[in-house]
């Protein structure tokens, strides 16, 4: 991966924020591309390992890489993902394989005790709402929604793309059950804890026994 770029106009090394081939990057004063989150003045740049800026934050306001303000819902979901990444960094090690990190995150979710905090009402950004039960106030426990939404966000933080949270009813009450779906397989932390760990860790829908009525992608 190239860490230095030069301006086609001046021939000098890029310094600071630059748009290259439609993507945004940040270079330090020596012209080296940053590949970790970076603070410049009052702005925090959230940067992927490929150097591409994913978002910016100034004060309490979140922006897209291009400087456009994120809608409140989108900003809330992105900040939830940042919390998930912080948890992953805290509970895994660089020497772990991807599958080891994945299962470590699953086990971290299971350690939280059961507690129903609210009745499901299909709230705006409800996957992030329930994930923050553990990311922000984990000592208060959570239910199947908290478990599954948290694990879904942790999976996204690990780089998994096809991540969903599912519910087996379209009712707005406490009758539904929630689980995570990742790459087409079911991951149900609550059932793994209460019934059979491996039966509900990476289950097929044929063996799982429930079908999704609500299915929401976690981005």
Say what each PLM segment does.
Residues 1-78, 167-181:
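Extracellular adhesion/carbohydrate-binding repeat motifs centered on closely spaced tryptophans
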Residues 217-219:
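Short, solvent-exposed mixed-charge patches
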Residues 146-211:
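Hydrophobic/aromatic-rich core segments of domains that either
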Residues 76-137:
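Secondary-structure boundary elements
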Residues 122-126, 141, 170-172:
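A glycine-rich, coil/turn loop motif that links secondary-structure elements
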Residues 34-37, 68-77, 124, 128-135, ...:
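General structural signal for secondary-structure boundaries
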Residues 131-146, 156:
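Periplasmic OmpA-like peptidoglycan-binding domain that tethers envelope proteins to the cell wall
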